[in-house]
Amino acid sequence: MEELQSFLEKDRSWXQHFLYPLLFQEYIYVFAHDHGLNGSIFYEPVNFLGYDKKSSAVLVKRLIIRMYQQNHLICSFNESNRNRFVGHNYYSYFYSLMISEGVSLIVEIPFSLQLKSSIEEIHNLRSIHSIFPFLEDKLSXLNYLXDILIPHPIHMXILVQILQSRSPDAPSLHFLRLFLHQYHNWNSLITPKKSISVISKENKRLFXXLYNSYISECEFLLVFLRKQSSYLPLTSSGVFLERTYYYGKIQRILVWQNFFQKTLWVFKDPXMHYVRYQGKVILGSKGTNFLMKKWKFYFVNLWQYYFHFWSQPCRIHINQLSNYSFYFLGYFSNVLKNPLSVRNQMLENSFLMDTLTKKFDTLVPVIPLISSLSKAKFCTVSGHPISKPIWTDLSDCDIINRFGRICRNLSHYHSGSSKKQSLYRIKYILRLSCARTLARKHKSTVRIFMQRVSSGLLEEFFTEEERVLSLIFPQTTFFSLRGSQRERIWYLDIIRINDLVTNF
């Protein structure tokens, strides 16, 4: 129990900051505008009403004055609900957007202070591709994989409570709770059907800050339990069970004790690996199916009794890795088994020995990529290329550069695939869509347009990355879509997923 308490204090000591006074400082809203995820929201509404940038600064000062008067602030929220699009009452809606960005920035400050101290040490590991070499080394030795869809709390107040456990700044949290309560009553922040699942574009930053605190709390408890499980051979089960009391409220102690009295001791697993991405979690283990069911049982009860919301067990799928292909960060990944027969010679006798090797394999998901291209209006649902009418107002060079950039980015991101033949079809769709767009702009057919221009017009921008790779590896292999179908390259400069990859 003392060990858990010290673990809690050490992990949460960084949160001893009182940030509420920052809400009444003008420079906070300037920072939120300059560095926010949606920096343009400060000027789009006022420009719509004819205000200039100087007038927006005046509105910030008016907002700070209103924030000193809590009742007036609540009235302004209600007023914005009734008059969002009526004349000059639109400034109330503008106030709500500024508060959302300002609160988001303040909530992010403690997390950014914690992240800044460690980000330089893991600079190379920031690349998305750095995960795949790790999976190549580890997954081939595992037996089971749990695919977990992280549930969302059904109410925003749960996220605020989670944030409260990490920050003693009660005034800021009280203001945030008041803001969310008032904002919940109208549709600009959250739809009335679900209070958290659908967030409008201008409030993604606030939701992301609250959601990250929730994920951080989940992983904090998981890391603690994982660390303690390694000491189980040296600790009696009775003493270890006392530590689970901290996971729930006082009234939940007996429930938690009954749930975990016969399960915690089987959590010993020296080869468990955890990867989180896009609201999902991959939990790999070298243990048995029974052990994975115990972890599933733990997650379901963690969400129910610690975070106080129900999570369906069907959100956690346990699969045997040798018979399972999973979608992960734009790839279909699986573990291939390759049986080998080796002839051994001992003196005058020889015999055959059968061995089994495992290899982590990554494939390009063609059908989902075509679906993404279809949603982006580059082709039909069946993969037939079509023109991009909204780009016909651009110059020919801009059109070619846009199509070429998309193709190069997809090739760059999927360079780790062992079978790149699938990219030929994606390249064909983008190339023909580019030709159709140019032909439409010049009011011609694709055949006539291609006869007029040089044959290398559409070939140049697709081969730029291949030329770069040939300079990096001049004496080894010629890396291209044709010459490196089985060569896998993982880059350290990919810090985000291509939009087309995440569009399905």
Curated annotation (Swiss-Prot):
One MF annotation (Gene Ontology) recorded for this entry: RNA binding
Q: Is Ligase one of the keywords?
A: no
**Listed GO CC annotations:** chloroplast
Cite the entry's keywords alphabetically.
Chloroplast, mRNA processing, Plastid, RNA-binding, tRNA processing
State the compartments where it is located: Plastid, Chloroplast
Q: What does this protein do?
A: Usually encoded in the trnK tRNA gene intron. Probably assists in splicing its own and other chloroplast group II introns.
PANTHER family per record: MATURASE K (PTHR34811:SF1)
Q: Name one Pfam family in it.
A: Intron_maturas2
Name the encoding gene, please.
Answer: matK
Give the main localization category.
plastid
- InterPro entries in alphabetical order: Domain_X, Maturase_MatK, Maturase_MatK_N
Entry's Gene Ontology BP terms: mRNA processing; RNA splicing; tRNA processing
Family to which this protein belongs = Belongs to the intron maturase 2 family. MatK subfamily.
Output this protein's name: Maturase K
Q: Which domain of life is it from?
A: Eukaryota
